């Protein structure tokens, strides 16, 4: 069962940081299984999920968040909003150094906001859209000036959302092509040591880390294990101490006395996996076709047989873990193949002599559950006369096909929806987030003036009750227009050795910095 907020809080309490002063490193090596070899090791420029685990150890965020939802100091020691919500002042921690010895300063923050997050990050484009400029009155003060309020902005200042990059290494370059993306100079508890493409990424303890006595582990090794069955086997033999496994293996691994299974359903890491349509394809411009696909898919079957009950059927683009904003009273599409057939007939897509209406392709994100979901959808759509070819490819080719070449009909895509709808969910539906080449953004090319107004109103509304109403309207529009079909609100399941302790030190879970972890 998913950890409740109270249970997760207890877990955090049990893994609380040791006192900084006088603490000594514990040493040792932690080996983490990673499903694929990321192209980049900084998520400042990308929201690809395979980047987060390693990148969050190399870069600290300006803030972090406790399980109680309250912000905590990291690179920023103090923060304050102006009364009108149009200025956010950050007082930075003195003495922080980049891994090359250069001082961390407000100039790095200003550069990252203005030249990186707003321009190149799929989530950052909407998250920081209201930030007009960043003033730096002194090296340890950054003042974000906004055109309109952004009540969610503090939530975006964590490492997994908005990593500050070193201005002295990026300014004047094309950030996307900067060689430091593959071998970062960060400011976090671990430093980049080396990578062996397709094999492993090695990080070492940062001896100059600002939090004295941390990190407590000497070395992190991210071992590339593309086969999830191989991850389970490596956990069982002790070859790796932390990893994500096929959900079909979880029940078996729970019985292993040397392992522990953590299932976390929290807003910071909540996700909705969905079927996306390429709305540039003429066939999908007809709403009846999209509705037919929704009625042809049994999401309960997917939850039971592919996700093995780890999550819930998604009836909204906002996952239930985001309790403040989730609403279930929106248009839904029950499993009804007969209705799907009638809608396809009404759209003029009648069966031919061979019983076929359409022949299309479906591209799943690389990963066991997405691929199995695509295979199930192929089977389900075949029953209503739609032939789908499942195309499998590596991660880089998938991203290029969907977001750069736009050479796809449908795709199975998952992505972090939190910690706030303006940060994680809006990117899929906001017309201004359509930009070929930017991964995991508005890949459907959905554009609706009414939707944009709802999202932009919610993005700036300071009254919590009014903001919830804007997001209710958003959910109703999303489920009415149906540019993507929410399938499963998945919980995050990780398996670890019981020797690994204190690795959760924030609401970011395994995407925290591991400064307190011991093995």
What kind of feature is each model-predicted range?
Residues 13, 151, 196-200, 205, ...:
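Detector for C-terminal structural segments
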Residues 33-83, 114, 185-187, 306:
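N-terminal lobe/hinge region of extracytoplasmic solute-binding protein
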Residues 37-52, 75-76, 102, 153-162, ...:
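A structural "hinge/loop" feature
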Residues 70, 158-215, 219, 229, ...:
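Gly/Pro-rich hinge or "lid" segments in bacterial periplasmic/extracellular proteins
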Residues 77-121, 137, 143-147, 234, ...:
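Aromatic- and charge-enriched surface segment that lines or borders ligand/interaction sites
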Residues 91, 125-170:
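Surface-exposed binding/hinge segments that line
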Residues 207-253, 266, 378-379, 387-389:
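Ligand-site clamp/hinge motif
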Residues 278, 313-347, 366-372:
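Structural transition elements
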């Amino acid at each position: 069962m998913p950890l409740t907020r109270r249970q997760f809080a207890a877990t955090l309490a049990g893994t609380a940081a040791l006192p900084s002063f006088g603490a000594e490193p514990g040493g040792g090596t932690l080996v983490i299984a990673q499903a694929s070899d990321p192209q980049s090791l900084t998520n400042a420029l990308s929201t690809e999920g395979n980047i987060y685990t390693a990148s969050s150890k190399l870069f600290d965020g300006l803030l972090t968040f406790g399980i109680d939802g309250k912000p905590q100091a990291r690179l920023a020691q103090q923060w304050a909003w102006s009364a009108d919500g149009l200025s956010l002042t950050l007082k930075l921690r003195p003495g922080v150094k980049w891994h090359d010895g250069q001082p961390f300063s407000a100039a790095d923050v200003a550069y990252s906001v203005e030249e990186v997050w707003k321009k190149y990050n799929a989530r950052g484009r909407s998250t920081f859209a209201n930030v007009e400029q960043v003033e730096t009155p002194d090296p340890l003060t950054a003042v974000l000036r906004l055109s309109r309020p952004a009540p969610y902005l503090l939530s975006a200042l964590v490492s997994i959302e908005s990593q500050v990059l070193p201005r002295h290494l990026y300014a004047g370059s094309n950030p996307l092509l900067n060689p430091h993306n593959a071998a970062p100079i960060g400011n976090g508890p671990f430093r980049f040591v080396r990578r062996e493409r397709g094999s492993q990424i090695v990080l070492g303890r940062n001896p100059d880390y600002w939090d004295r006595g941390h990190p407590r582990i000497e070395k992190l090794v991210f071992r590339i294990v593309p086969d999830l069955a191989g991850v389970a086997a490596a956990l069982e033999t002790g070859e790796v101490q932390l990893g994500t496994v096929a959900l079909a293996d979880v029940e078996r691994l729970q019985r292993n006395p040397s392992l522990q299974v953590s299932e976390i359903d929290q807003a910071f890491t909540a996700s909705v996996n969905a079927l996306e349509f390429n709305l540039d394809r003429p066939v999908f411009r007809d709403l009846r076709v999209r509705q037919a696909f929704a009625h042809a898919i049994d999401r309960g079957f997917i939850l039971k047989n592919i996700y093995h009950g780890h999550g819930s059927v998604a009836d909204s683009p906002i996952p239930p873990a985001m309790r403040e904003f989730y609403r279930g009273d929106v248009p839904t599409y029950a499993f009804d193949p007969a209705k799907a057939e009638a809608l396809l007939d009404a759209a003029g897509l009648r069966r031919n002599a061979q019983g076929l209406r359409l022949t299309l392709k479906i591209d799943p994100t690389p990963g066991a559950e997405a691929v199995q979901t695509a295979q199930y959808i192929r089977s389900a759509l075949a029953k209503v006369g739609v032939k789908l070819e499942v195309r499998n490819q590596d991660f880089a080719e998938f991203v290029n096909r969907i977001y750069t070449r736009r050479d796809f009909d449908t795709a199975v895509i998952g992505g972090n929806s939190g910690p706030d709808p303006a940060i994680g969910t809006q990117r899929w539906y906001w017309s201004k987030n359509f930009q070929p080449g930017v991964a995991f953004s508005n890949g459907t090319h959905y554009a609706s003036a009414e939707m944009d107004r709802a999202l932009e109103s919610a993005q700036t509304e300071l009254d919590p009750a009014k903001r919830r109403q804007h997001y209710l309207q958003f959910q109703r529009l999303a489920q009415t227009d149906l540019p993507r079909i929410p399938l499963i609100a998945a919980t995050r399941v990780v398996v670890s050795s019981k020797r690994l302790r204190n690795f959760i030190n924030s609401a970011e879970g395994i995407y925290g910095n591991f400064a307190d972890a011991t093995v």
